[in-house]
Amino acid sequence: MTIPLYEVLILASILFAMGLACVVAWRANVIMMLIGIEIMLNAVMLTFVGGSAHWGIAEGQVFSLMIMALTSAEVSLALAMVAYLHRRKQSVDTDDFSSMKG
C-alpha cells in the first residue's frame, strides 16, 4: 500500500505553513523561531522522502539524511547561543542578540 504523492505534498505544505506561521508569529522569541524552522525543515524532508518513494530513487532519502545532520548542527549551535544569551541578559528575545557582537 503506497501513499499517493499528492497527499504527501499536501501534508508537507500544511507542515511548512505551520512552521512559517510559528516563525512569523513568534519573531521575538528565539526558541519558538527555532521550533518553527525545525517544522519547516521536516516538511522539506517529508517532500524529499515522498518524491523518492514515488519515483523509486534514493537521492531524496540521502538529502533527508543530510538535512537531519544540518539541523542537528544548527540546533546545537543555536541553543548554545540562546543559553549564553539567557545567562547574560535573562531573556531570549531576538532584540538582545545584537549585544552579542564579537
From Swiss-Prot:
Disulfide bonds: none annotated. It catalyses: a quinone + NADH + 5 H(+)(in) = a quinol + NAD(+) + 4 H(+)(out). The keyword Cell membrane applies. InterPro entries: NADH_UbQ_OxRdtase_chain4L/K, NUOK/Mnh_C1-like. Its EC number is 7.1.1.-. One of its GO terms (biological process) is ATP synthesis coupled electron transport. Gene3D superfamilies: 1.10.287.3510. It is a multi-pass membrane protein. Keywords: Cell inner membrane, Cell membrane, Membrane, NAD, Quinone, Translocase, Transmembrane, Transmembrane helix, Transport, Ubiquinone. The keyword Transmembrane applies. GO terms for molecular function: NADH:ubiquinone reductase (non-electrogenic) activity; quinone binding. Its main location: membrane. The chain crosses the membrane at residues 5-25, 30-50, 62-82. GO terms for cellular component: NADH dehydrogenase complex; plasma membrane. It is found in: Cell inner membrane. NDH-1 is composed of 14 different subunits. Subunits NuoA, H, J, K, L, M, N constitute the membrane sector of the complex. Belongs to the complex I subunit 4L family. HAMAP family: NDH1_NuoK. NDH-1 shuttles electrons from NADH, via FMN and iron-sulfur (Fe-S) centers, to quinones in the respiratory chain. The immediate electron acceptor for the enzyme in this species is believed to be ubiquinone. Couples the redox reaction to proton translocation (for every two electrons transferred, four hydrogen ions are translocated across the cytoplasmic membrane), and thus conserves the redox energy in a proton gradient. This is NADH-quinone oxidoreductase subunit K 1. It comes from Citrifermentans bemidjiense (strain ATCC BAA-1014 / DSM 16622 / JCM 12645 / Bem) (Geobacter bemidjiensis). The gene is nuoK1.
